[in-house]
């Protein structure tokens, strides 16, 4: 019997992008269901009753929540194509450290640029320093996993579609400050899995501009 795979998602979510990319890298066919985050479906509330958030990966009726956990699950469940995590225990731990860093540092700081009035400039400066730390880790490698596109790349690349948002509202230039990281992002976008998962930056800017108006930030 064929696997039934459903992804509850939202187009602009960098976390949903992670799961889309991982599934594409593994060539897993799935039913993509776009959620209305302001009118969540009964299926989403049933499958993720704790956080009530997307993305939710449903595999044969069983939910897997949180995007980094989903990447691991996908890698272990469909091991044949394109390994996403290193097999070496140390390299695996190292990759998990940086993915955790991205969630705790990049996401939290970047959100302040567009969602908190009066903190845009300060948060943008902090974000640049965080991205420079990631740029140092990348070094001269093709990907964060050397020659292999994988876990850390997937964890970070979705934020690239939001870079224009951070630049617009934070009044910074990520390309001039972190040119190596932007070059890495362009390499990632050459992969079909990434190109199809990431929305156009202008679409994200329009969405966030509308959200800011509704939140009374503009």
Curated annotation (Swiss-Prot):
It catalyses: RX + glutathione = an S-substituted glutathione + a halide anion + H(+). The keyword Cytoplasm applies. Residues 3-82 form the GST N-terminal domain. Glutathione binds at residues 13-14, 39-40, 53-54, 66-67. It comes from Arabidopsis thaliana (Mouse-ear cress). Belongs to the GST superfamily. Tau family. Coiled coil: none annotated. May be involved in the conjugation of reduced glutathione to a wide number of exogenous and endogenous hydrophobic electrophiles and have a detoxification role against certain herbicides. This is Glutathione S-transferase U24. Pfam families: GST_C, GST_N. Gene3D superfamilies: 1.20.1050.10, Glutaredoxin. Keywords: Cytoplasm, Detoxification, Phosphoprotein, Stress response, Transferase. Its main location: cytoplasm. CDD domains: GST_C_Tau, GST_N_Tau. One of its GO terms (cellular component) is cytoplasm. PANTHER family: GLUTATHIONE S-TRANSFERASE U24, GLUTATHIONE S-TRANSFERASE, GST, SUPERFAMILY, GST DOMAIN CONTAINING. Its EC number is 2.5.1.18. Induction: By acetochlor, metolachlor, 2,4,6-trinitrotoluene (TNT) and 2,6-dinitrotoluene (2,6-DNT). The modification Phosphothreonine is found at residue 148.
